[in-house]
């Protein structure tokens, strides 16, 4: 399940569980489905799902607001709704930046941020 630009599907997750855990393919599929269903059920109830060293899935309530139709420019009411948000953990962010193509950009951005914080603190 490594590589860049690839989409990992349920089938891929089931296969990884099958290969790494040693469950049968049927059991692996049932396991993955059970985990995804539990996450979905919690989010439907408005609960936050926090997975240590991975991140948090949370539901936010967005209020009604006025938007614009980009073609006509007319105002359009946007109904209140709930949206799901994923907030990655600091550990996951570090792993992505260490292993991804954005690592060089992140390092230079972090270095620049470090320079600013050092000059602000007087060190």
From Swiss-Prot:
CDD domains under this entry?
IHF_A (cd13835)
> What are the record keywords, sorted?
DNA recombination, DNA-binding, Transcription, Transcription regulation, Translation regulation
Q: Where is this region: Disordered?
A: 97-123
Q: InterPro entries per the record?
A: Hist_DNA-bd (IPR000119), Histone-like_DNA-bd_CS (IPR020816), IHF-like_DNA-bd_dom_sf (IPR010992), IHF_alpha (IPR005684)
Q: Which GO terms describe its cellular component?
A: cytosol
Q: Name one Pfam family in it.
A: Bac_DNA_binding
Q: Name one GO biological process term.
A: positive regulation of metabolic process
Q: Where is the composition biased (Low complexity)?
A: 102-113
One GO molecular-function annotation for this sequence?
Answer: DNA binding
Q: What does this protein do?
A: This protein is one of the two subunits of integration host factor, a specific DNA-binding protein that functions in genetic recombination as well as in transcriptional and translational control.
Describe the family membership recorded for this protein in Swiss-Prot or TrEMBL.
Answer: Belongs to the bacterial histone-like protein family.
Q: How does it assemble?
A: Heterodimer of an alpha and a beta chain.
Q: What is this protein called?
A: Integration host factor subunit alpha
Q: Which organism is it from?
A: Rhodopseudomonas palustris (strain HaA2)
Give the taxonomic lineage as stored in the record: Bacteria, Pseudomonadati, Pseudomonadota, Alphaproteobacteria, Hyphomicrobiales
Gene coding for it: ihfA
């Amino acid at each position: 399940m490594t590589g860049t630009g690839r989409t990992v599907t349920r089938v891929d997750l089931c296969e990884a569980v099958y290969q790494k855990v040693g469950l049968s393919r049927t059991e692996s599929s049932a396991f993955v489905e059970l985990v995804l269903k539990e996450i979905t059920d919690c989010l439907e109830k408005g609960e936050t799902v926090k997975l240590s060293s991975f991140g948090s899935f949370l539901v936010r309530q967005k209020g009604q607001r006025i938007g614009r139709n980009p073609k006509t420019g007319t105002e359009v009411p946007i109904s209140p709704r709930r949206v799901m948000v994923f907030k990655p953990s600091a550990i996951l962010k570090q792993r992505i930046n260490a292993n991804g193509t954005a690592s060089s950009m992140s390092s230079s951005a972090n270095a620049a941020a470090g320079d600013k914080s050092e000059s602000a603190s007087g060190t």
